[in-house]
Amino acid sequence: MAHKKGQGSTRNGRDSHSKRLGIKEFSGEVVKAGHILLRQRGTKFKPGKNVGMGRDFTLYSLVHGQVEWDGSRRLVHVKPFNTA
């Protein structure tokens, strides 16, 4: 008989890396074209005016302007600055 217990294996020790989802630019913030506004899984929020949606449902700005969130309809808009 063994005097010491053999080393068993554990069933723990695994975890996935966080995906860094969520809102990146809030209402009133100034963004340039191409800035990421939101990372999400699925279409929890939908793109509004001057906002594009990537293949992984990421919302990004299409123009230089100010971010506007429409909370009631879950839309994100970017209000462009007037260029004279």
UniProtKB/Swiss-Prot annotation:
The keyword Protein biosynthesis does not apply. Residues 1-21 are annotated as: Disordered. PROSITE patterns: RIBOSOMAL_L27. GO terms for biological process: translation. Residues 12-21 have a biased composition (Basic and acidic residues). It comes from the Bacteria. One of its GO terms (molecular function) is structural constituent of ribosome. Keywords: Ribonucleoprotein, Ribosomal protein. One of its GO terms (cellular component) is ribosome. It holds the Pfam family Ribosomal_L27. Belongs to the bacterial ribosomal protein bL27 family. NCBIfam families: L27. This is Large ribosomal subunit protein bL27. The lineage of its organism: Bacteria, Pseudomonadati, Verrucomicrobiota, Methylacidiphilae, Methylacidiphilales.
